[in-house]
Design a protein with these regions (language model features):
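Basic, amphipathic N-terminal segments that precede the first structured/catalytic domain
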Residues: 19-34
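Extended, charge-rich helix/loop segments that form flexible
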Residues: 121-214
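Asp-box/BNR beta-propeller blade signature and adjacent active/binding-site loops
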Residues: 52-55, 59-64
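A short glycine/small-residue-enriched secondary-structure motif
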Residues: 21-25, 62-78
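Glycine-rich, proline-tolerant flexible connector loops at the mouths of alpha/beta enzymes
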Residues: 30-47
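Transmembrane-helix bundle segments that line or gate the permeation/cavity pathway
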Residues: 66, 70, 104-107, 111-114
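Histidine-acidic metal/acid-base catalytic patches
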Residues: 1-4, 9-11, 17-23, 76-104, ...
C-alpha cells in the first residue's frame, strides 16, 4: 500500500512539514477554495502541487500529491437539472488538468446535497479521547425541529419523534449549535455549506428524484466522462455513502454491495472504480466488507481505513480506535495485500493509496483548533497501528 495522509491545504492546522514526519509518502488533498463546481485550472493545481513537493534541502523527504479527494460533483449534475451540462464540461476540464499534472487517482461521491454526516463532533470516550458520533434521534430532531421538514414522519416513528424532541429540549445551546454546524455542511470534507433556508430549498429540488433516478443520473454522468478516464488512465473512485442511510429523505445509491455491483456494471473497467471506506460500509452490519474486497478487489483504487462501533438496537454509531471496533482490520488488510499481490503478478501497478481515515482528538490536539475527525496526533496513532499490521502480514 502507498501510505498517504489527508491535508486540507495551507489553512489546515496540520502543516506539510508535520505530515512529512508521520511516516507517509503521499498527500491526499482538494482545491476547496475553488468555487463549487467550477474548473480546477492548471495554475491552481500546479500551485498546490508545488507546496506539497517543496523541500528545503535534498535531505528532506519529498512528498507527492497522490490523490485528489474530492473533485466535487455539483448537485445540478446529481439531480440532472439546472446548469448540469455546464458543470459536466467544467468537470471534464478538471479531470484533464489533474491528469496532465500526474494526479491520476481521483475520489468523488454522489451523495445528494450533504457529504458525510455526524451529529456529535465532541463525543467523549472513556479514556477522554474525543470522537465523532452519529445519533439517529438527534438527526430526527434536526429534521423535525430545526428544518421543520413536513414529511419527516415518513422516516421516523411517532415514538422516535417524541423521544427526539425530549433529547433536543435537554441539549445545551452549544450542543444545538454544534448539531446545526455539522448538518449544514460544517465538516471539512463537505463540498458546500448551507443556511437552513438554502438547505430546505435544495432538499425540495431533490424531492422528485428517487433511488432509480439518482442511479440513472450517475450512469449518465459516467457515460459523459468515461472516455476521459480511459484516455488519461485516471483511477476514478466513488466514495460510499456515509452513513449508508437516506438523509433528509433523499436517496443514497452507494451504500452496499448491490450498489457497487450496479456501478461496476456500467463500465467493467478499473478506471470506473471505488474507494474502499471500511468505516462507511461497516455502519450497515449487513455489509460484508471482506466479501466485497474478494468480489470487487480489482475496482479498488483508493482505501480509507477507519473503524466504528455500532449500537445494537439503533442506527447510532461512533468512530472507534482503528483496531478496536466492528471492522476486523487484520482480515481487511490481509485481503488488500492479497489483491495487491494479484496485481503485481499480472504486471499491473499494485500499490493502492491508503490513508488512515479520521482519528480521535487526543493529547495536545485537544487544546488546539482542529478540523473535526482530522487530529494530526489521532491520525498518526491510527496510521502507526495500521502500519504495524501491514508490516506483520508482509
Amino acid at each position: 500500500m502507498e501510505l498517504t495522509f489527508r491535508w486540507f491545504g495551507p489553512n489546515d492546522p496540520a502543516k506539510i512539514n508535520h505530515i512529512r514526519q508521520v511516516g507517509v509518502t503521499g498527500i491526499v488533498t482538494s482545491l476547496n477554495h475553488i468555487k463549487y463546481g467550477e474548473k480546477w485550472i492548471d495554475y491552481e493545481i500546479k500551485k498546490r502541487k508545488k507546496i506539497i513537493n517543496e523541500v528545503k534541502s535534498s535531505k528532506e523527504l519529498k512528498l507527492k500529491w497522490s490523490v485528489a479527494e474530492s473533485l466535487p460533483v455539483h448537485n445540478d449534475i446529481k439531480s440532472r437539472s439546472g446548469k448540469y451540462k455546464y458543470y459536466i464540461d467544467q468537470y471534464k476540464d478538471s479531470l484533464v488538468n489533474l491528469s496532465k499534472n500526474q494526479i491520476k487517482t481521483i475520489c468523488y461521491n454522489f451523495m445528494p446535497l450533504i457529504d458525510w454526516v455526524r451529529t456529535d463532533l465532541n463525543y467523549k470516550l472513556k479514556n477522554n479521547a474525543i470522537a465523532l458520533k452519529y445519533d439517529h434521534l438527534k438527526m430526527c430532531a434536526f429534521e423535525v425541529i430545526i428544518l421543520k421538514i413536513k414529511d419527516a414522519d415518513k422516516r421516523y416513528t411517532k415514538k422516535q419523534i417524541i423521544k427526539a424532541k425530549e433529547i433536543f429540549k435537554k441539549m445545551k445551546n452549544s450542543e444545538k449549535h454544534s448539531l446545526k454546524k455539522s448538518l449544514l455542511g460544517g465538516l471539512a470534507a463537505n463540498d458546500r455549506k448551507f443556511s437552513i433556508n438554502e438547505l430546505k430549498y435544495e432538499i425540495d429540488k431533490f424531492k422528485e428524484i428517487n433511488h432509480t433516478d439518482l442511479r440513472n443520473n450517475l450512469k449518465n454522468f459516467l457515460v459523459e466522462i468515461f472516455p476521459i478516464l480511459k484516455e488519461h488512465k485516471i483511477k476514478y473512485c466513488i466514495h460510499p455513502d456515509d452513513p449508508p442511510y437516506n438523509i433528509f429523505g433523499l436517496p443514497r445509491i452507494m451504500s452496499n454491495e448491490n450498489d457497487i455491483k450496479y456501478l461496476t456494471s456500467i463500465f467493467k473497467h478499473e478506471n470506473n472504480g471505488i474507494t474502499l471506506c471500511t468505516g462507511s460500509l461497516s455502519v450497515d452490519k449487513k455489509n460484508n466488507i471482506e466479501r466485497i474486497i474478494k468480489k470487487y478487489g480489482k475496482y479498488i483504487n483508493f482505501i480509507h481505513l477507519r473503524n466504528i462501533k455500532r449500537d445494537t438496537n439503533s442506527k447510532n454509531f461512533y468512530e472507534s480506535d482503528h483496531l478496536d471496533g466492528d471492522v476486523n482490520m487484520v482480515n481487511i488488510i490481509k485481503l488488500i495485500l492479497k489483491e495487491e499481490k494479484r496485481r503485481k503478478r499480472n504486471n499491473r501497478p499494485f500499490n493502492i493509496p491508503m490513508r488512515p481515515d479520521h482519528g480521535h482528538t487526543i493529547i495536545y490536539d485537544q487544546d488546539k483548533k482542529i478540523i473535526p475527525g482530522y487530529s494530526l496526533l489521532g491520525r498518526m496513532k491510527g496510521l502507526a497501528e495500521l502500519k504495524g499490521i501491514i508490516k506483520a502480514l508482509n
